[in-house]
């Protein structure tokens, strides 16, 4: 994925009313996130499940400033991304209709490992979860945090 495509994908994910399912519909219909933003309203209206509110929200230019800030954070923190159409996207997630468009990871993680715990929806780990991980119960497995 090019920097430009990552930028537009991050922007698409910032559009109000666009989650992973809608984003994938738009990307698959238009070809990529860059083309989603370049598409005419009449073309977007033909996509099943894409309503006038989402089409209107795609015109919100503030999503690009948010995407730029996200790109800077990714570079600053040395975070890598895996796109849902990438060859190395986890096989088990490819079969989930609502799997993330982008995975973010820090460090060297084998996303195809057979024993993995996924934590979805949080960037702040709770005290209870910290205790659970430190207890040694899950030492030989990888942990994913999706947010």
PLM segments and residue spans:
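Short, positively charged patches
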Residues: 1-134
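Phosphate/pyrophosphate-binding betaalpha-module
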Residues: 138-147
């Amino acid at each position: 994925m090019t920097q430009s495509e990552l930028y537009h994908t991050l922007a698409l994910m910032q559009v109000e009313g666009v989650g992973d399912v809608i984003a994938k519909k738009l990307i698959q219909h238009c070809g990529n996130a860059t083309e989603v933003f370049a598409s005419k309203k009449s073309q977007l209206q033909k996509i099943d499940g894409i309503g006038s509110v989402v089409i209107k929200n795609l015109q919100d230019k503030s999503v690009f400033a948010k995407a730029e800030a996200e790109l800077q954070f990714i570079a600053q923190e040395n975070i890598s991304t895996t796109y849902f159409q990438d060859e190395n996207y986890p096989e088990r997630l490819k079969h989930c209709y609502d799997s993330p468009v982008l995975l973010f990871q820090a460090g060297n993680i084998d996303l195809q490992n057979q024993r993995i715990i996924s934590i979805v929806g949080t960037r702040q780990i709770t005290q209870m979860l910290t205790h659970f991980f430190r207890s040694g119960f899950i030492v030989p497995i990888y942990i994913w945090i999706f947010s």
